[in-house]
């Protein structure tokens, strides 16, 4: 089982200025965690620390109980801007992380096509990014993040610029990927309903620390679509109230 841990982690940009303060956090295989908070609360910096993209000023980042000294190799990233290479076809954009490391094989191409099919965009494999919609570009970015078969997927505001219907479709697809492939996922988002729908655990950050953490309700007891239930609406309300408390702190 994969395990990623932040142990008493702090990060200091300048003297006496901490963007992350003494954070303890743990993510395991198959879990989805979402971090919420105002801009500048430390969410993205903490994600970079967890991924090994930054070194903590104090504390430890542990992957499989081993200190992280460099960027993690078994991790995929999805950002708000898909940053697809406009002169490369969809299939080539997806295969790019492999191409940067070694020669592409027929097995790699077959897996890329399988990801396209899973994300319902198999008909786009030979198209160029300029011909794609925002939702299609996001699906390509997800496939590219998964092509190396990572155990971790980190997403920083991946669907912020998309319309509600497309956003919910992609959330459904990521939830399916999480459950079918047992991938651990971390989301940084401002969208309360997105966090409530996806996350096993939600954390609200303020001034570089978690001021609220909450385990998700037991959705297995919900017979209908979870977004349509009173339990989901009440859960979103609870999270929003915690965010409002940070605004007045």
How should each PLM-predicted stretch be described?
Residues 36-38:
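The feature captures the beta-strand-to-loop junction immediately N-terminal to the Walker
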Residues 59-71:
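Conserved ABC transporter NBD signature motif
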Residues 147-151:
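A short, proline-enriched helix->beta-strand linker immediately N-terminal to the Walker B motif
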Residues 51:
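Helix-to-loop junction immediately C-terminal to a conserved catalytic motif
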Residues 106-124, 176:
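Conserved ABC ATPase "signature" region
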Residues 153-156:
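Catalytic Walker B motif of ABC-type/P-loop ATPase nucleotide-binding domains
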Residues 128-132, 136:
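Conserved ABC ATPase signature
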């Amino acid at each position: 089982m994969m395990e990623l841990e932040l142990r008493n982690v702090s990060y200091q940009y300048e003297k006496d200025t901490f963007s992350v303060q003494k954070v303890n956090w743990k993510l395991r295989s198959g879990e989805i965690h979402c971090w919420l908070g105002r801009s500048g609360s430390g969410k993205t910096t903490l994600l970079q620390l967890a991924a090994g993209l930054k070194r903590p000023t104090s504390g430890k980042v542990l992957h499989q109980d081993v200190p992280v000294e460099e960027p993690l190799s078994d991790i995929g990233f999805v950002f708000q801007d898909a940053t697809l290479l406009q002169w490369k076809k969809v299939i080539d954009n997806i295969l790019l992380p492999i191409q940067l490391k070694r020669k592409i094989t027929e097995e790699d191409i077959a897996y890329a096509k399988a990801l396209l099919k899973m994300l319902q965009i198999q008909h786009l494999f030979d198209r160029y990014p300029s011909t794609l919609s925002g939702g299609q570009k996001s699906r390509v970015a997800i496939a590219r993040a998964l092509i190396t078969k990572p155990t971790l997927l980190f997403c920083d505001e991946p669907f912020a610029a998309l319309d509600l219907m497309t956003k919910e479709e992609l959330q459904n697809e990521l939830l399916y990927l999480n459950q079918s492939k047992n991938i651990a996922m971390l989301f940084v988002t401002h969208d309360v309903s997105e966090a409530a729908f996806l996350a096993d655990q939600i954390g609200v950050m303020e001034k570089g620390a978690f001021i609220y953490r909450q385990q998700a309700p037991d959705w297995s007891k919900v017979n209908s679509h979870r977004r349509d239930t009173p339990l989901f609406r009440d859960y979103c309300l609870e999270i929003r109230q915690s965010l409002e408390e940070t605004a007045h702190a």
